[in-house]
């Protein structure tokens, strides 16, 4: 019988994310050598990659890093979302470590989409290869879902845990000029809570605005509103849409009497961009 202890089983489970029975079988096969056992788990896991492709990976984490810009004055924010099948794996040290490596590769490569990041170098392997390797070790489908890169004179970030036992599930980056840097983090917290879709009204697609206007008018007519009041009613409802979807028009979470745009204007600065990820959304 292979020579290993309960502590060895516990350590290997934490490293691999594999079940107790699989860990014991691997240790037996490796004659108690933990490193060989980990390799056995990984090899067996690779054989199951194809079987896992059809599974859903809706758990995971969001990771963010802000670095100084090299070519211009200011900062660069980089954010990634990495998905797994279960929250058990999402909080596993191997998975969290993988996310850190993926994030570092995203920063180094300046990738702006998942395909570019998957092809990027991650210490001698591509990001795709280290994700597949971790999937084999952990025995779950892992997916690099998306990456965002945001440039600004200042980039404020906020990470939110939906459960204290899990890594961050919501991540936000907010870019401002230097004058508005003092409110960037508070606005990032606001974005996490209120999930705006657009920065300004000008960013809303014209067709979407036209559709909202048409729906508002049809609804008002169906409600029997007087013809002479339709224009005012439609504009009011369209403004309601903007207040719900546009960041600078939203009531500020910390002081609802002001809009986010007003809070930024009071600093004399400008809000230049934002990105928000929520795991699985």
Swiss-Prot record:
Organism: Beutenbergia cavernae (strain ATCC BAA-8 / DSM 12333 / CCUG 43141 / JCM 11478 / NBRC 16432 / NCIMB 13614 / HKI 0122)
Protein name: Elongation factor Ts
Metal-binding keyword on record: no
Keyword rRNA processing applies: no
Keywords from the named record: Cytoplasm, Elongation factor, Protein biosynthesis
Family stated for the protein in its record: Belongs to the EF-Ts family.
Main location: cytoplasm
UniProt xrefs under InterPro entries: EF-Ts_dimer_sf (IPR036402), Transl_elong_EFTs/EF1B (IPR001816), Transl_elong_EFTs/EF1B_dimer (IPR014039), Transl_elong_Ts_CS (IPR018101), UBA-like_sf (IPR009060)
